[in-house]
């Protein structure tokens, strides 16, 4: 049975780690990096998660450009799994494919949308409630101002004739 950790980040840069197993873990199995998964699997009701990366139990990273879930040795010049110290340096690195499997130990995911993780977990109140009321008032004032401007323009045209 699959069991792994899911590290979820949002646009604010905050991250949370969740452990999933059994049925919740099965929602991730077979998915590729870049696919979307329902947030209910980790307790984020109403959210959608995009799979962004991961690693196996030995710490080998998942790469989006390697198909399947098997290990593959690549000659890398940089990117996911290897950071060269000199220009032109290359190294053969073992990486995993882009598909989540039983060998996956950690999956990295990002919340799709602007809702922070704390709001999705119910730890904080959404900040949008205060902003909506103010923006509606501003929109009404702008409409009244525009209407007055049109009447003034009509008077100016009549005076010009």
Swiss-Prot record:
Residues 119-161 are annotated as: Disordered. Transmembrane segments: none annotated. GO terms for molecular function: structural constituent of ribosome. Pfam families: Ribosomal_S6e. Keywords: Ribonucleoprotein, Ribosomal protein. InterPro entries: Ribosomal_eS6, Ribosomal_eS6_arc, Ribosomal_eS6_CS. GO terms for cellular component: ribonucleoprotein complex; ribosome. It comes from the Archaea. One of its GO terms (biological process) is translation. Residues 122-161 have a biased composition (Acidic residues). PANTHER family: 40S RIBOSOMAL PROTEIN S6. Belongs to the eukaryotic ribosomal protein eS6 family. This is Small ribosomal subunit protein eS6. It comes from Haloquadratum walsbyi (strain DSM 16790 / HBSQ001).
